[in-house]
């Protein structure tokens, strides 16, 4: 939850489905699908929406290429300067000071992202200016809610530190289920699921409240008002 993807990944998902079917799913329909907890991968989500709409299903690689064309607008492995796609429409939700604050509060940090590595590295390293940030991106581990990536990252960050608490912040049911599954696989650690509603809902009080309730129902331990609010939560935990 460090960038607003309503105009990029969500838009590419809509455009991909429309490309194959002529039907453009509404944001609320995508939210409902994501709320099921198993469609964190936007390629899979695109295929599932096509299936439910009764549209012929394309070959997976063909769909990935179409999606990538909308999202990157160029070769994902090429220089970001050559990209002309929706990735250029991603307002940042945080700045680099957040991670310095987290470090100052005594916590290590890293990222488990469902984004392709070029996209994740671009936002973390070039836009936020983070140097070699700990990152598990698409392809480095199975898609969430499989906890492998979170378990791997937490092991790397906590190894030798003596710390036993892991807090993971996400904005989907799949993120919460990832924490729950990690807890089942590694019960010796304290796992905390932090959740936040995606920014496209922040100006829709009723929809946001309903979305946050779904996150709570899925097992979120704490609902935050924004990603930047994580430092307030960390300070509050230090006082208890």
Give the location of each predicted region.
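Helix-loop "lid/cap" segments that line or gate small-molecule binding pockets
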Residues: 14-20, 43-58, 153
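Short, acidic loop-to-helix structural element flanking the phosphoryl-transfer center
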Residues: 70-111, 115-122
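Short, surface-exposed acidic
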Residues: 21-34, 54-69, 74-76, 130-133, ...
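Short amphipathic alpha-helix with an adjacent loop that forms part of the alpha/beta core around
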Residues: 155-158, 230-240
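Active-site neighborhood of HAD-like aspartate-dependent phosphohydrolases
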Residues: 1-32, 44
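Acidic, Mg2+-coordinating phosphoryl-transfer loop and its flanking beta/alpha structural elements
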Residues: 168-222
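Short acidic-hydrophobic, aromatic-tinged amphipathic segments that line or gate anion-handling sites
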Residues: 221-230
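Substrate-recognition "cap/lid" segment bordering the active-site pocket of phosphatases
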Residues: 110, 115-167, 173-191
């Amino acid at each position: 939850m460090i960038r607003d993807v309503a105009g990029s990944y969500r838009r590419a998902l809509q455009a991909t489905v429309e490309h194959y079917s002529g039907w453009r799913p509404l944001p609320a329909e995508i939210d409902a699908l994501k709320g099921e907890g198993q469609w964190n991968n936007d390629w899979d989500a695109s295929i599932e929406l096509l299936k439910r709409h009764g549209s012929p299903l394309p070959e997976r690689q063909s769909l990935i290429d179409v999606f990538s064309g909308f999202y990157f607008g160029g070769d994902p492995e090429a220089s970001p300067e050559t990209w002309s796609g929706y990735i250029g429409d991603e307002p940042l939700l945080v700045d680099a000071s957040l991670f310095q604050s987290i470090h100052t509060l005594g916590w290590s940090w890293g990222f488990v992202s469902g984004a392709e590595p070029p996209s994740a590295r671009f936002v973390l390293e070039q836009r936020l200016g983070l140097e070699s940030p700990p990152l598990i991106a698409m392809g480095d581990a199975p898609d969430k809610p499989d906890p492998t990536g979170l378990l791997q990252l937490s092991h790397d960050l906590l190894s030798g530190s003596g710390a036993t608490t892991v807090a993971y912040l996400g904005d989907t049911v799949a993120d919460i289920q990832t924490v729950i599954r990690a807890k089942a696989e590694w019960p010796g650690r304290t796992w905390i699921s932090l959740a936040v509603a995606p920014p496209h809902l922040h100006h829709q009080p009723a929809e946001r409240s309903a979305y946050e309730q779904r996150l709570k129902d899925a097992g979120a331990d704490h609902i935050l008002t924004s990603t930047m609010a994580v430092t307030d939560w960390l300070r509050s935990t230090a006082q208890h």
